[in-house]
Design a protein with these regions (language model features):
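Hydrophobic, aromatic-enriched interface-forming segments
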Residues: 118-209
């Protein structure tokens, strides 16, 4: 079967487990919004993982609370697979196909520990500021880090994602970090670290408990850790990151609880669902038409301030 998943560490771990279980033999990495909007062809030969449900798929695995709200899963949708709230979609697949009996080596090597921590944002300030091992790999392989915006690598990020499926099944974490295609991305990540922090500070405004990071006027959005703002702004408990979408036709809002100040109570996934997006209680994203961006931003900001 063919896997359709997103290009992040959780998507990678899903691919590793599904290939280990003999379920898939090909892959397609996509943006979840494209799946939700019907822009990705889906057939009964496809396994959807960590992306919105599409009728007619062969298998579906997910862990986003907004999908259960969107589809009212218990009564209205029939599918093969599993969808339930979880720290990662990989953990849903892990449990579905036998847990430790089948996948013990991925507990032993630390991959499952890392994907649960990174995808749920269960990270310490030290892990954000000084990432090592699997946690570092989780940042390097996440499209939101921004390393894929550069085109001067030996191979593309999509090719590296494909190669990493084999690496994670056959190599130790230390060996993976020594792969030249991984090393050059690690080097870029650390070389831009201080400039990335400066960029975040220069484009952040604080509104009570909410930080708004508006990067629409930034010519080159540097690569960096998407959690760093929570270390830089410990008094705020939720962030809204604002960037241009494709061809500046829409604006993307990425909203998330602070992982260092865990006092926000708003349901982010449900809020994003109102704007055609989705997510979990603590994190989510949506895209809105450019002409409605300011109106939408103010409405989202009002909800987050009220739920702070």
């Amino acid at each position: 079967m063919n896997l359709i998943t997103r290009s992040d560490f959780d998507g990678l771990a899903c691919a590793v487990l599904l290939e280990e279980a003999g379920i898939i033999d090909s892959y397609k990495f996509v943006h979840p919004k494209d799946v939700q909007d019907g822009l990705v062809e889906v057939t009964p030969n496809d396994v959807l993982a960590n992306v919105p449900y599409v009728p007619g798929c062969g298998l579906w695995f997910d862990h986003h609370s907004s999908e259960q709200e969107r589809l009212k899963l218990l009564s209205e949708v029939k599918y093969e697979g599993m969808s339930r709230p979880s720290r990662s979609c990989a953990r849903v697949i892990y449990d579905y196909y036998g847990g430790a009996k089948r996948f013990q080596k991925f507990e032993d090597n630390g991959m499952m520990w890392a994907v649960d921590k990174s995808d749920s944002g269960d990270l310490t300030s030290e892990e954000i500021l000084f990432p090592t091992g699997w946690i570092l790999l989780s940042f390097i392989m996440d499209a939101r880090t921004g390393l894929g915006r550069y085109r001067d690598y030996r191979i593309s990020n999509i090719q590296l994602m494909t190669d990493m499926i084999k690496y994670c099944r056959t190599m130790t974490m230390e060996e993976i970090l020594e792969v030249p295609d991984v090393k050059e991305r690690v080097q870029r990540y650390f070389s831009q670290e201080l400039k990335y922090e400066a960029m975040i500070k220069a484009h952040t405004t604080v509104h009570d408990n909410v930080m708004v990071i508006d990067l629409r006027d930034v010519e080159e959005i540097l690569s960096g850790n998407r959690f760093i703002e929570y270390v830089l702004y410990p008094e705020q408990n939720v962030s809204i990151r604002v960037i241009w979408g494709k061809m500046k036709q829409n604006v993307v809002f990425t909203v998330g609880y602070s992982i260092t100040n865990r006092t926000c109570t708003a349901d982010i996934g449900s809020l994003m669902l109102r704007y055609g997006g989705g997510g979990h209680k603590m994190v989510g994203t949506c895209q809105v038409p450019a002409e409605k961006a300011e109106e939408s931003l103010q409405a989202i900001l009002a909800v987050l301030k009220a739920g702070g």
